[in-house]
C-alpha cells in the first residue's frame, strides 16, 4: 500500500483557501472501489477541508441506535497530509441538523494533485452531539482480519488509531479545534 508523504503534490497552494475539487479513490477490501468527488473549501498545507453537498447513500448511517447521516445529507470532510490514519466528517441529517463527528480509520491518503487514494480499514469512531463516544464496526474489522483482507501489522495500527481517537474524544481533546470550527454554514459560505 502506498502512503502519503509530506512531499506529496498539494491539491491547492497552501494559502488557507480552497478551490477546485478532488477525486477520491476509496477502496474497501476485498474488492470495492468508490470514486468520490468533493469540492475543496480550504487547504492550509496540512489539512484539506472538502465539501460533500449530498451524501450518496443507499441507507442511513447509524451510531448508538440513532441515524447520524441520511441519504442526501451534507458532510464537511477533513483529510490530513502525512502519516495520518483517519479522516473526519462532520455529519448531518438531510435537513442540516448537526449530529456529530465521524472518523474513518484508513490508510494514510496518497495525494497526487486532485487524485487521492486510500483504503478503508473498517473501524470508525463516533462522537455524537451528546458526547457519546464509540468505536464502530469492530465485527466487520474482525471479519476482514480473519478473511486476510488486512494484514496483522495494518490491523494493529488501525485498532491503535481507533482506540487513541476514542480516548482523545473522551478526554475532550478530539476532534481538533480546526474541525470544530468548520460548521455547515461556514462550508456553505466557502463554496458560494
Question: Where is each model-derived feature located?
Answer:
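A generic local secondary-structure boundary/capping motif
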Residues: 11-12, 37-39, 111-114, 123-124
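A short, polar/proline- and glycine-enriched secondary-structure boundary/capping micro-motif
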Residues: 59-64, 113, 144-148
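Short acidic-glycine loop/turn motifs at beta-strand connectors
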Residues: 43-46, 94-95, 128-130
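Short, well-ordered strand-loop elements centered on a beta-strand within folded domains, enriched
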Residues: 48-51, 97-104, 132-139
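Cysteine/selenocysteine-centered motifs that mediate thiol-based redox chemistry or coordinate metal-sulfur cofactors
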Residues: 160-192
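Phosphate/ribose-recognition catalytic cores of enzymes acting on nucleotide-derived substrates
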Residues: 67-110, 116, 120-123
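A hydrophobic, small-residue-rich beta->alpha segment in the mid-to-C-terminal subdomain
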Residues: 121-166
Amino acid at each position: 500500500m502506498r502512503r502519503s508523504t509530506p512531499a506529496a503534490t498539494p491539491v491547492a497552494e497552501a494559502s488557507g483557501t480552497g478551490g477546485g475539487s478532488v477525486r477520491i479513490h476509496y477502496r474497501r477490501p476485498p474488492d470495492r472501489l468508490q470514486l468520490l468527488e468533493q469540492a475543496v473549501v480550504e487547504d492550509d498545507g496540512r489539512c484539506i477541508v472538502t465539501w460533500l453537498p449530498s451524501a450518496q447513500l443507499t441507507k442511513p448511517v447509524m451510531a448508538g441506535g440513532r441515524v447520524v447521516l441520511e441519504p442526501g445529507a451534507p458532510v464537511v470532510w477533513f483529510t490530513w497530509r502525512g502519516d495520518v490514519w483517519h479522516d473526519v466528517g462532520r455529519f448531518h441529517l438531510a435537513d442540516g441538523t448537526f449530529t456529530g463527528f465521524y472518523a474513518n480509520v484508513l490508510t494514510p491518503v496518497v495525494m497526487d494533485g486532485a487524485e487521492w487514494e486510500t483504503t478503508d480499514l473498517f473501524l470508525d469512531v463516533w462522537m455524537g452531539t451528546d458526547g457519546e463516544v464509540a468505536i464502530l464496526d469492530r465485527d466487520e474489522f474482525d471479519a476482514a482480519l480473519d478473511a486476510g483482507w488486512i494484514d496483522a501489522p495494518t490491523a494493529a495500527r488501525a485498532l491503535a488509531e481507533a482506540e487513541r481517537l476514542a480516548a482523545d474524544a473522551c478526554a475532550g481533546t478530539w476532534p481538533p479545534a480546526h474541525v470544530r470550527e468548520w460548521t455547515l454554514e461556514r462550508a456553505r459560505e466557502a463554496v458560494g
